[in-house]
Amino acid sequence: PYFDYEGKPYDNIVVLSREDAEHAYVFGNRLYITEHPLYEQDGVLYLIAGEEEERVRIYEEAGEPADMYVLPPEIMTRVSVATRETSQTQPPAYAIQSILEQEKAHNVCKVYELQLTYDKVRDEYADDTSEDYLQDVYLTMNYGGNRAQLYQDGKLLTDWFSNGEDWTVALKRYGYPKYLTLVVYPYEEEVYYDLQPRKGCELHEASAHAVYKLEV
């Protein structure tokens, strides 16, 4: 790029690509580029990341950028999700339904039981001083249908209207539940979405992964 200055030029100009600019953070006199969330708490920088080594590029006020590598946690949480489709084809008695939906005689659904197993795994460098930096666990569901509801012990936790993307739910706020019920409602009406909607009425896949709060 070409720069036309008025007055005294700056000592250092950093030109970022669009992708880097979308992943840029400024703390103090430093510019940080990272693909993962970065925030400051009590004067300490933390990166929210997974189980891989992550690179953070740092720009000072002058000089060339330097790369910092944040190591993965020594104690990790591996989460597996087992799914079972029930024989129900009508919304459970506790499912929240609008009056309009209740009037639809053809309004069938599919109900799935989800069982989540949380296992702690220690890497070869872990010892008695190693800490558990678990920040959250995200449950991701790929389903075809108009919308879905997630329940725990008959209580609605959250719901989602299909927009062509996977549905991801943070589980920390719900106490990392082990058993959940998913209700999927059929895709019936042609509605405009940015992404191609996933038609049908079924759960295709459910998975979960953990993220960690790592000091930079």
Q: Could you tell me what each predicted segment is?
A:
Residues P1-V216:
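Non-catalytic C-terminal accessory domains or segments of carbohydrate-active enzymes
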